[in-house]
Regions:
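Amphipathic, small/basic residue-rich leader segments at the start of a protein or domain
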Residues: 1-87, 106-110, 114-117
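N-terminal glycine-rich flavin-associated loop
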Residues: 84-106, 132
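A short, Trp-centered hydrophobic/proline-enriched beta-strand micro-motif
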Residues: 118-126, 170
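Glycine-rich phosphate/pyrophosphate-binding beta-alpha loops
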Residues: 132, 156-162, 245-249
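A structural signal for short hydrophobic beta-strand segments in well-ordered beta-sheet cores
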Residues: 140-143
Length: 261
């Protein structure tokens, strides 16, 4: 197996390096002190088309793969921005992969182009305070209504929820005790992060203040039926299409930070 970068991947590194050179130590120190989202940096990445690196061309993406996205994220993380720069965008790189894989053509066209164009930001609503890594034990509940679903529950350690317009939300549609396995009965939605029904509370951290971490209290959030991805009850299988790339990209980011150190 050849582990050398291709010419195209080296071009990705060089292009990212050019962008990151405009955002040095002073920029990231200021963001980490005042806690403001790095919007200027985010829009520079949008302008270069980098949020669509791993998405199909038919929705405005570049049609490249996760290996290419890893090259990009490693280059970002090896800059002055380190994990702050990487985590400001990586949800928008890996999170919607479940939409690209399992969404209808209408959903893909409705949801993916605004992310790639920087018109909408999204959050990843999976982790809960009482389930941790045991996703099958999450308790956020989506109940059917005449027009779709209504959701009650709680999520924690949700990045960028202060600025997100949308949320990729995993919720239980069938009680766990009625399922053969805990991972059954979960459904995946991509919907508005509506503050009228979602109380988003930022969690203070020792670092990476420019990328907010949050607890979200969800009280009767209405979700249209058209915002359900795929089949009801198959959400855990779908979310793996986002979670697996996330782990790979975070590994690449760690390598980038280590190389720069």
């Amino acid at each position: 197996m050849d582990f050398q970068l291709t010419d195209e991947q080296r071009a990705i590194e060089d292009a990212i390096g050019q962008i990151m050179s405009d955002f040095g130590d002073d920029y990231w120190l200021e963001r980490d002190c005042d806690g403001g989202f790095p919007e200027e940096y985010y829009q520079a990445m949008v302008a270069g088309g980098w949020l669509g690196v791993a998405f199909p061309e038919e929705v405005g993406g570049s049609g490249l793969g996760i290996a290419d996205a890893c090259v990009m994220m490693r280059a970002i993380a090896s800059s002055a921005g380190a994990m702050s720069a990487a985590s400001a965008i990586h949800m928008n790189v890996f999170g919607p992969k479940a939409v690209a894989a399992f969404g209808t053509d209408e959903q893909k066209q409705r949801w993916l182009p605004p992310i790639i164009a920087g018109e909408q930001k999204t959050a990843f609503g999976v982790t809960e305070p009482n389930s941790g890594l045991d996703t099958g034990s999450l308790t956020t509940k989506a109940e059917r209504t005449n027009t779709g679903y209504v959701v009650h529950g709680r999520k924690v350690w949700i990045s960028t929820a202060q600025v997100a317009d949308k949320i990729l939300l995993l919720a239980r549609t069938t009680p766990k005790d009625e399922c053969e396995r805990g991972i059954d009965g979960l459904s995946l939605f991509y919907t508005d992060l509506d503050r009228d029904y979602c109380d988003v509370r930022e969690i203070d951290k020792m670092g990476r203040k420019s990328v907010d971490s949050n607890e979200i209290f969800i009280d009767a959030l209405p979700i249209p039926a058209d915002d359900l991805i795929g089949e009801e009850g198959m959400g855990f299988r779908y979310i793996l299409q986002s979670m697996n790339p996330e782990r790979i990209l975070i590994g690449a980011e760690a390598v980038g930070i280590g190389q720069e150190a």
